[in-house]
Amino acid sequence: MRVWIDADACPKAAKDQVVRFALKRQFEVVLVAGQAQIKPAFACVRLIVVPSGPDAADDYLVEHAVPGELVICSDVPLADRLVKKGLAALDPRGKEFDAQNMGERLAVRNLFTDLREQGQVSGGQAPYGDREKQAFANALDRILTRLARQA
């Protein structure tokens, strides 16, 4: 099994949680980034730095991840591409992307993008705290268990 991470936008705490699961459950973690990052010093972790460019890391993830694997990403359009390819996708706050919720997630994302562009909404997400870390760990455990059963 392999877990891919869109590393540029993923909080360090979430990346660290995936590595802890990987050490315990014996799977590979692939960090895909558009810029250099510090790679955790474990054999189960690989870092791939893609050439810079719009959506280069996203395109790499869509091209290389295969059904039965999990991708951690915050990017809703990327998650849509992954789900359509048959992959499991999870955001660092513990919300799984799936065929049933992608339409709604895309609509909400597009609405907030439009509102931000019009100056009607400012700011971003709440800080990544203990509640988000716990929700992510719970969802990660649930999805990894499901994928292991399907393998």
Curated annotation (Swiss-Prot):
Top-level taxon of the source organism: Bacteria
Family annotation (InterPro entries): UPF0178
NCBIfam families documented for this protein: PRK00124.1
Family indicated by similarity: Belongs to the UPF0178 family.
Protein name: UPF0178 protein PFL_5989
Organism of derivation: Pseudomonas fluorescens (strain ATCC BAA-477 / NRRL B-23932 / Pf-5)
Phylogenetic lineage: Bacteria, Pseudomonadati, Pseudomonadota, Gammaproteobacteria, Pseudomonadales
